[in-house]
Amino acid sequence: MNFDIEKLDSQMASDEKKLFFIQTYGCQMNEEDSEKLSGMLKRMGYENTENRDEASIIIFNTCCVRENAENKVFGNLGALKKQKEKNPDLVIGICGCMMQQKGMADDILKRFPYVNIIFGTHNSYKFPEYLNRVKTEGVQIKEIIDKETEIVEGIPIDRKSDIKGFVTIMYGCNNFCTYCIVPYVRGRERSRKPEDIVNEIKDMVTRGYKEVTLLGQNVNSYGKGLEENITFADLLRKVNEIEGLERIRFMTSHPKDLTLDVVYAIRDCDKVCEQIHLPVQSGSDRILKEMNRHYTKEQYITLAKKIRAEIPDVTFSTDIIVGFPGETEEDFSETLELAKEVRYDAAFTFIYSRRNHTPADKMENQIPDEIKHERFNRLVEIVNTGIAKGNKDAEGKIYEVLVEGYSKNDEAKLTGRTRNGRLVNFEGGEDLIGKLVNVKIIKANSFSLIGEVEK
C-alpha cells in the first residue's frame, strides 16, 4: 500500500507556533519510526525543536522491552501536566510498542487525561489524520490496531544524518523468545518487496547518503511471505550492486537463522561491512532452552568461528541477559566463558526485566535483584576487557573511516567508524565530513580509537 501524499499535503499546519518535539525510546526500529513521524510533520509545514517547552506538538515514541523505559515515559508524561495547563492547545501524542500492550492505552488516559492522541506500531502513518481531527474537532483519539497491517510504502522520512541512514527491510518477529514482548507488540514477520527497498536506497544515494543499515527484528528471516523467492543473502547482493552506495550494515541476526550463504555474501560483497550483531543472550544451554532460542552454546561458538574463518577482520557485537529466571551461578559462569571465548567488540548487557504476558514472567525462581546486579557487574568487566583488547590490537593499523561529523566529546576532532564498526576520533577539516578517508590508529581508548589521517 502506498502512502497518500496528496492527502497529507491537504493537512498543512495552521498553528502560529509550528514546532514539534519527538522523544524516542528503544531500538533502531523506533528511531526510524520517529524519523517518519518527523518527515510527515515537516511535510505539513512543522519544524523540529529540541526544546520541549516551546513545542506545540509533543510525541513520545515508546519502548516496552524493559520496565525502565516505561517508567521514563510515565515520568515525562507527568511532567507535561503544567505545560498543558499553561498551553491548552498543546497536542500530546503517545505511540510505539508500549501502547500495544493490553490495557496500557486506557491506563495512560486514566492517569494522564490530558493526552490527546494514542496510537500503536501498526498505524503511525495515520498520525497526520489524527492530528487534524484533534485540531478541527477537538476530540481525544485512541486507536490501537492489534493485528499487523499491510506495509505502507512512501511515507516521508526525515533522517537524522545526511550521510548514513536506517532502511527497514522487514517488520515483526515470529520467534517468541520467552522473555521478549516484541512479537506481541510488533506482530508477525512481514517483508518489504526487494524493489521497494532498492528504490529507497537508490533515492538516498541521489541525496548523498553513503551508508545504509538494513533493519529487522531478524533480518535472516527476510523473504518470508513474499511472492518472489528471495533470501536475505540475495537481498545483500542486490543492494551491493547499487551504484554510488559505499557501505551496507544490517541488524539484527538470530544465530539460528544465520546461514553460510549470508556469511559468504558478507565476504564477497565489497560494500557489506565486516560487522555482525549476533545476540547470544546466555551461554548456558539450559537457559537458552528456557529462553526458546533454538541453539546451544557450542553451536553459537562454532558459528562465530566459521564467520571468523571466512571474514578475518569481522567484529561481533551481542546482547546478553543477566538474571533470567532460574539462572544459577553455574549457568552464569557458562555465559562468562562464552564472552571470553568469542571476545565481543561491543555488547548490550541487560539485567532481566519481567514483561507482562510473556512466558518468562510466569516462571518460578525469579532471581533477586542483588544477585542480578552482582552478576551484571562481573559480566560488564569481562566484556569491557575484550573490547579494550580489540581496540588495543587496532593500534598502528590503517582503517578506512566514513567521516560522520564532529566528535560529541571533542568538537575539535572529527569522528567516524571503520568498516568493522570501531569509533575513531581524529583531527581534520570540515571538508572531510561525508567522505571515506584512511586513518592510522595511534592510540586505543577503552571504547574508541584516536587516529590521524593518512596523507
Swiss-Prot record:
Keyword Metal-binding in record: yes
Listed GO MF terms: 4 iron, 4 sulfur cluster binding; metal ion binding; N6-isopentenyladenosine methylthiotransferase activity
Main location: cytoplasm
Catalytic activity: N(6)-dimethylallyladenosine(37) in tRNA + (sulfur carrier)-SH + AH2 + 2 S-adenosyl-L-methionine = 2-methylsulfanyl-N(6)-dimethylallyladenosine(37) in tRNA + (sulfur carrier)-H + 5'-deoxyadenosine + L-methionine + A + S-adenosyl-L-homocysteine + 2 H(+)
Domain TRAM: 392-455
CDD domains assigned to the protein according to its UniProt record, in alphabetical order: Radical_SAM
Domain MTTase N-terminal: start-end pairs: 18-136
Cofactor(s) for this UniProt protein: [4Fe-4S] cluster
Assembly and interaction partners: Monomer.
NCBIfam families in alphabetical order: miaB-methiolase, MiaB/RimO family radical SAM methylthiotransferase
Protein name: tRNA-2-methylthio-N(6)-dimethylallyladenosine synthase
